[in-house]
A protein has these predicted regions:
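N-terminal secretory signal peptides that target proteins for export/translocation
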Residues: 1-9
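Intrinsically disordered, low-complexity segments enriched in Ser/Pro/Gly/Ala and basic residues
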Residues: 3-4, 24, 185
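Bacterial N-terminal signal peptides
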Residues: 13-25
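Sec/Tat signal peptide C-region and signal peptidase I cleavage site
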Residues: 26-32
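Transmembrane beta-barrel domains of Gram-negative outer membranes and organellar outer membranes
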Residues: 33-171, 176-181, 187-197, 201-205, ...
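A contiguous binding-surface segment within folded domains or other stable secondary-structure elements
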Residues: 209-247
Length: 329
C-alpha cells in the first residue's frame, strides 16, 4: 500500500511541483516539443534534394547531355552511322555499305566531372573532351548546368575530298585542329519529360573556302520522353547562326568561286532502350558525323533531299571502383 501510494500520488505531485517551480507547465513542455519538431522539419526542408536521371546517358543522339558518370566508372561507346537511305538498294543496300564508326571512352574523375576520348572513321578524327556539372537541379535550383569543352584533330592526308566535295589541303598540323565548347542547360519536368538547351561555339583552324567562317555559333535544343521504364523517345536540333543555302538550290559547291557550301542544320530522332548496364540508342538523322565539329559545323545532309542516315549508339558502363565492387561480394 505504501509503495502504491508513493508511485500513484507522490511522484505525479512532485513532478507537477517541479514544473511549477521551474516556471513552466506540462502543456508548455508539449508545445516546446512541437516547436522543436517544426524547426527540425524546416531545417530538413532547406536541405537540397537533387534530381537524378534527367537523361539516361551522357549523349542524347549525336550531342552531349548534362549527365556525367559516377566517380571511377568507365563508359565505352560504340557509334555507327550508315549511308543515306536515298543511296539506293543495289548500289549501297540503302546505306549499309557506307558505315562510319566512332569508338569512345569516358571516365568519371568525380561524380560531376568526366573526361572523354574517341576516334571516328569520318575524316579519321581523334577527339578529346571534358564535362563538368556546374549546377544540379534540386528543390531549390530549377535547372542543371554542365560545361563542356572539346578538341579534335583531322588526320586525313592533305588533299583529301571532304564530305562537301571540295579538297582540303593542310599546310601544317595546327591547321588540322578544331575546338568546341558548350553550355548544356536542362530541366527534368517530371519522370517522363526532360528538355535541354545546348548553346555551342565551334572554331575550325582551316576551312575549305574563304567564304566559310572559321568560327560559328549554334543553338541546340533537345529532349526525351519516357514511354516506359526502359524505352524513351528522344530528339535534338542544332540551329547554326550563319547563312544557309536554299534547300531547293541544287548548284554544286564551287570552292574556288567563293560559293558557300550548303551546310545544314542537324535534326535527329531516336529511340533509347535501357537494359541493365547497357543503353541502346537507335536513330534517324541527317548528320553522319559524330564529333561536334562535324555534325554541327559541317553537316551536309538534307532531310528534304532524302539524306537520312540511320544508326545507333551502344553505351556500356564499367565500375573501376574496387571498394564498390568488394561491397557487393
Amino acid at each position: 500500500m505504501v509503495r502504491s501510494f508513493f508511485t500513484q500520488r507522490l511522484l505525479p505531485a512532485g513532478y507537477l511541483f517541479l514544473l511549477l517551480f521551474l516556471g513552466t507547465s506540462p502543456w508548455k513542455t508539449v508545445a516546446a516539443q512541437d516547436d522543436l519538431l517544426s524547426l527540425l522539419d524546416a531545417e530538413q526542408a532547406k536541405e537540397p534534394s537533387y534530381t537524378i536521371a534527367t537523361f539516361k546517358a551522357s549523349r542524347l543522339i549525336n550531342g552531349q547531355t548534362i549527365e556525367t558518370i559516377s566517380k571511377n566508372h568507365l563508359n565505352f561507346w560504340i557509334s555507327h552511322r550508315f549511308g543515306a537511305v536515298n543511296s539506293g538498294f543495289i548500289a549501297n543496300f540503302f546505306g549499309l555499305d557506307e558505315a562510319k564508326i566512332r569508338l569512345g571512352l569516358e571516365y568519371g574523375l568525380t561524380d560531376r566531372w568526366l573526361v572523354g576520348a574517341g576516334r571516328s572513321s569520318l575524316e579519321k578524327t581523334y577527339d578529346l573532351y571534358t564535362k563538368y556539372k556546374v549546377l544540379r537541379q534540386s528543390n531549390t535550383v530549377p535547372i542543371t548546368v554542365t560545361a563542356m569543352a572539346g578538341w579534335g584533330i583531322n588526320t586525313m592526308p592533305t588533299g583529301y575530298i571532304m564530305e562537301s566535295g571540295s579538297p582540303m589541303k593542310f599546310n601544317n598540323n595546327i591547321e588540322r585542329y578544331s575546338y568546341w565548347s558548350q553550355l548544356l542547360v536542362a530541366r527534368k519536368f517530371n519522370e517522363k519529360l526532360s528538355l535541354q538547351l545546348m548553346p555551342t561555339l565551334i572554331h575550325v583552324n582551316k576551312v575549305e573556302d574563304p567564304s566559310i567562317p572559321n568560327q560559328l555559333f549554334s543553338l541546340g535544343a533537345g529532349g526525351r520522353y519516357k514511354l516506359s521504364q526502359r524505352i524513351t523517345l528522344s530528339a535534338e536540333y542544332y540551329y547554326t547562326l550563319r547563312e544557309l543555302e536554299d534547300e531547293d538550290d541544287d548548284d554544286d559547291y564551287d570552292a574556288n568561286g567563293g560559293i558557300p557550301y550548303p551546310y545544314r542544320n542537324a535534326l535527329s530522332f531516336g529511340v533509347d532502350i535501357e537494359t541493365g548496364g547497357h543503353v541502346f540508342q537507335f536513330h534517324l538523322t541527317n548528320a553522319r558525323g559524330m564529333v561536334e565539329k562535324q555534325f554541327i559545323g559541317q553537316n551536309v545532309g538534307s532531310w528534304g533531299k532524302g539524306d537520312i542516315f540511320y544508326g545507333f549508339n551502344i553505351a556500356r558502363t564499367f565500375s573501376l571502383d574496387k571498394a564498390a565492387r568488394n561491397s557487393h561480394k
